[in-house]
Amino acid sequence: MSNVDAQHTEELGVETELEGTVVVPAVPTDSVAPLFTNPADWFVPPFPEKLEGLDVSAGFLADLALKTVPLDAECSTASIAHRMRLGMLITEALLQRLTHEKLIEIKGMVGLHNHRYAMLDHGWDALRRLMSFCSYAGPAPVSLKSYTEMITQQVRNRPPASRQALDQAMSNLILSDYAKEILGLVVGSGRSLFLTGPSGNGKTATARALVDALPGEIWIPYAIEVDGQVIRMFDTHSHLPVPHTNDDYDRRWVRIRPPLVVVGGELTLASLDLAYTETQRFYEAPLQVKSNGGVLLVDDLGRQRCSATELLNRWIVPLEYRIDYLTLSTGKKIQMPFEQIVVFATNLTEADLEDEAFMRRMGYRLHAEAPSAETYTEIFLRYARSRGIFADENLVMQLLRKYQTEGRIPKACDPRDLIDRAIDRCRLLRQPIKLTEQGLEVVWKGYFGLPHTDPKR
């Protein structure tokens, strides 16, 4: 394949349905990079031995140390080193600098390179000035350059997902081999996915399973520094730390599982930029930055507070060039890496969006159809087993006939919802947990309401 043909194939992407045929684009052999089993094992951030070896200025770190001193009643070199995630020698050098500037004083010795410190009056004055500019006090940040290099190397040297890993990640879903192959291509390539289909047929669950198929872990910093400003990166809601057996690494970084960030109707254009408040006086990374190295799921596209067209236009440059531009409160724009799998899940059609430029940039497209009778039965029986309940296939057949009688289209989520409600009823009536025709009839009415064919509707 020529480079021109390869580029054309990449732009068009691949479109398929869950029950359809997969067309796999060829990849030029010269585009394959060396891959590692677990990039986090190869790109361990080295432990900094000296202050001069850090990628952030000593002056900035000294200011951060001054903001950290008052946080502990018994402040010591060790306590500051722990809070700032720096080595003892570097931390002691920063504190000695503050001592020479008459901002803090030594109150005693705890051990080798470990002293007790206290604030002086000049230190409190300096602290107030610093807090009026930036109130961040926590792990020392890394530079934007270091973050960009680290996240890019890790993501682009990630190995392809194995079929076994993909099958395990999708084990709770019932998908065709074709759909699994497309999802494997999404995971292996890191390209975006446009996931369409009626609501309730597993689009969100499928997107969530993608992150479980991503191999290995990644390193991210707690924070980054740009022009003396701090952007907090680590988020306990989005990032799950994993143990690292080797203690000889830069503790300003944390090893995590590939993150999953989910956003739905609450998404606004403003939430895609740096969040800055006057009270904390530092920035919070936007959701697409927090999802770097993992999966960003834009769920229920078309129901956001901004229009779908505005939102899609915002993503065109990042999807095309793998970079994003964010704006500081000063008006300065900074360039951020855009290294994640973006999944757009929607019940809209491509015709509804009417954005050809955006659709060209979709790596892959997948359509989730309503389940067939066989698939519905398998979903029902499998979920019943997972809840420890026996399910008679005859009961499932009766449910399928009710769909036809009432003019309803089955959804993949219906078996779970009906079984859960049947369990609710058994518990309410203090009956043994089991599925019965009478019980399912009651919860059916409570779940669906009046049939579509009922004249009272």
Name every feature range the model reports, one short phrase each.
Residues 377-441:
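Conserved AAA+ ATPase small/helical "lid" subdomain
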Residues 71-83:
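Short acidic, hydrophobic short linear motifs in intrinsically disordered regions
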Residues 152-180, 406-409:
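Dynamic helix-loop-helix/coil hinge segments at AAA+ ATPase domain boundaries and subdomain interfaces
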Residues 99-111:
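A short, conserved structural fragment
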Residues 52, 113-163, 447-456:
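Short, amphipathic alpha-helical interaction segments positioned at domain boundaries
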Residues 174-343:
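Conserved ASCE/P-loop NTPase catalytic core
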Residues 314, 354-370:
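A short helix-turn-beta junction within AAA+ P-loop NTPase domains corresponding to the substrate/partner-engaging
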